[in-house]
Amino acid sequence: MLVVAEENHAGCHSMNAEALGNVQVNWPDGERMSLPILWLRDVCPCEACRIAQTQEKRFHLATLETVSIETLGVSDEALWVAWTGGHSSQYPRSFLAKDHARVMPQWQPWSDDYTPAYFDFQAFQANDRMALLAIEEFLRSGVLILSNAPTEEATLELLAKRLGPIREVLFERIHNVKVDPRGYNVAHTNLGLPPHNDFASYSWPPSVQALHMLANEASGGRSTIFDGWALLEEFRSAEPEAFDVLCRVEVPFREFDESNETYACEPIIRLNTKGEIVIFRYSNQLMQVMNPADPDTAVFYDAYYKLSRRLFSSDKVRRFRLEGGQILIVASHRVLHGREVIDDAGYRHLQDAYFEHDNVRNMLTVLARSHD
């Protein structure tokens, strides 16, 4: 039950209840502000409602049988509310006008002349300002290359300082990629790797991947990266029905060896509630056989074929040779990666590990706070 008592008194301006449980605030300078009543009660900043030490909420709306306002008042810079039941709240005007959503660098599609940004590994690790710039670039483009990194195994463990803890997956914490006749994955052959992201067979695939080249004496085997989200936005405009199919139809993915198995059945494209792309899950090598009797299978394959043709003929690909001592970092829910054919048997050793995008964004927040 929502009740607002309309009251005028000296020094106060009138507040009128609106439909949908809002109250209209008329500020002395003429600005009007419409505020949800339940929201007002929920965000009361007083120490009885919020833990000052942690800024967590102490009060819970569910403890009130009804919510009603007895009196309200405004000054130039604050709103006062006296709630039925005896509680009072004071809200700074700046708090009521603020967009409280966290602002992060927005992803940007690659320009026609885009090339990955290179940062020095030691500077990235030791210099907070350099790390801040590098992470901002990573959140915009989805790609970062670190140069002059050590070529010792397990160097990727050091990135936890900037990227957060390694995301553990089955198989190996740090994965070794060499040509290996006993390998369980196509990456262990000299074959080219088509565009993909790793572990599509997880319901939540790792969202950041770091690929560290320890040694690269082989010819061929250039690295490839693809701006998957930019491609999908073009596909959404050109083929909206096919795009919707790829958001709706679940696809089975599986990766396994003699000791472990991962399996997920998920759409290739996942959107958030705003319709924005949040995951592009693409791995032709891990995709499993779909049921041909399911009517969705035919429409899925029509859409999948159209998307794949567009991907393989796309100008969204960048090719480069990853040298020993370089680390390629990709936002793997957005950027697909691959590899051209390795032409000879020269020694080539790469290690990769996984991290989480949330933890990278956390590091940006921490670094930005220290440089305000």
Predicted regions and their residues:
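Active-site environment of non-heme Fe oxygenases that use a 2-His-1-carboxylate facial triad
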Residues: A101, W107-L133, E137-V143, N148-A149, ...
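Motif-centric detector for short Cys/His coordination patterns
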Residues: M1-N127, A131
